[in-house]
A protein has these predicted regions:
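Solvent-exposed edge beta-strands and adjacent loop segments
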Residues: 1-83, 129-147
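Short beta-strand and beta-hairpin "edge-sheet" elements
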Residues: 56-64, 112-163, 267
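Oligomerization/assembly interface segments of phage tail-like spikes and tubes
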Residues: 64-96, 147-164
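Short, acidic/charged, Gly/Pro-enriched secondary-structure junctions
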Residues: 89-128
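Extended Gly/Ser/Thr-rich low-complexity repeat segments
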Residues: 99-110, 172-177, 247-260
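Beta-strand-rich domain onsets/edges
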Residues: 173-197
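Beta-strand-rich structural segments
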Residues: 191-212
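The feature marks long extracellular or luminal low-complexity segments
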Residues: 210-268
Length: 268
């Protein structure tokens, strides 16, 4: 054991966001903002899932368990389970539904703070890993009250909090992740009454995104859509020329990303 402190003492600032990855999936050592955005659109299991912004933090658990046996001396017996809870800016109905859907799933999680420190887990390799979490889940107040707006928190339960602390590590970034990361939203390629006409609509709430992406999709139709030879865009409607007998659909987000179509994924 040694009790010295780092020659570069850190004044730890507030955590501002998190990045979820599948267990064992790491951010690359030479990470850049552009690479983070690309990874948000990557094919699974290599995709990353950002959650932000965090406004407040509360710790639950993670306390030393010290007990005596009979009249013997007190002895350390580990740390109690710990959950880190962060308050978001507002209730987000889409994020809430997605987190609930995956609440029984474990993740590796990176955090970043105000000083752009990327916080993670030292797994004895040259590349920082995410902190293993047994579950990540939301808690919401969906509707405003007389004294407060609707609200949402996201909680991260450590798989082994003592192990998390023993292997705590970080790297300094030269950019702010919040300026680059972008979580994806589920959309449908919705068929309209007129033949071969479509819109891009968000699954939850039905918000129409066609105006935002219509021209890009039409310009690269054969590259960004399955079973389509060409397309045009006009007045909020995408008109396609489909391949015979085939159902048109958007390609994977990794393909859309290369054509400048970002932040969406078509679901069945």
């Amino acid at each position: 054991m040694n009790t010295g402190s780092s020659a570069c003492s850190i004044d730890w600032k507030k955590v501002k966001g998190a990045i979820l990855t599948e267990h064992g999936v790491k951010l690359p050592a030479d990470i850049t903002g552009e690479k983070l955005l690309e990874l948000c659109h990557a094919d699974r299991p290599g995709r990353i899932y950002p959650i932000l912004p965090f406004l407040e933090y509360a710790k639950n658990g993670g306390e030393p368990q010290v007990n005596a046996v009979g009249y013997g001396a007190s002895e350390y017996n580990g740390l109690s389970a710990q959950t880190d809870t962060f308050t978001l800016k507002k209730f987000d109905e889409v994020l809430n539904a997605q987190l609930l859907k995956c609440a029984n799933k474990g993740w590796d999680v990176y955090f970043w703070n105000q000083d752009n420190m990327l916080i993670g887990y030292n797994d004895d390799t040259d590349i920082l890993a995410g902190i293993p979490m047994s579950t990540v889940y939301p808690t919401v107040t969906q509707y405003p009250t007389s004294s407060a707006k609707s609200a949402m928190t996201v909680s991260f339960s450590h798989e082994d909090v003592e192990d998390s602390q023993l292997h705590f590590d970080y790297v300094q970034l030269d950019f702010n992740p919040k300026n680059f990361v972008k979580g994806l939203v589920d959309v449908v390629f919705q068929k309209l009454e007129a033949e071969n006409t479509y819109k891009i609509v968000e699954v939850v709430g039905g918000y129409d995104r066609t105006e935002e992406f219509g021209s890009l999709i039409a310009d690269g139709a054969a590259d960004v859509m399955n079973n389509v030879t060409s397309a045009t865009y006009s007045d909020g409607i995408i008109t396609i020329v489909p391949k015979a007998g085939a159902v048109p659909s958007l390609k994977a987000p990794s393909v859309l990303y290369e054509k400048g179509i970002r932040g969406i994924e078509q679901v069945a």
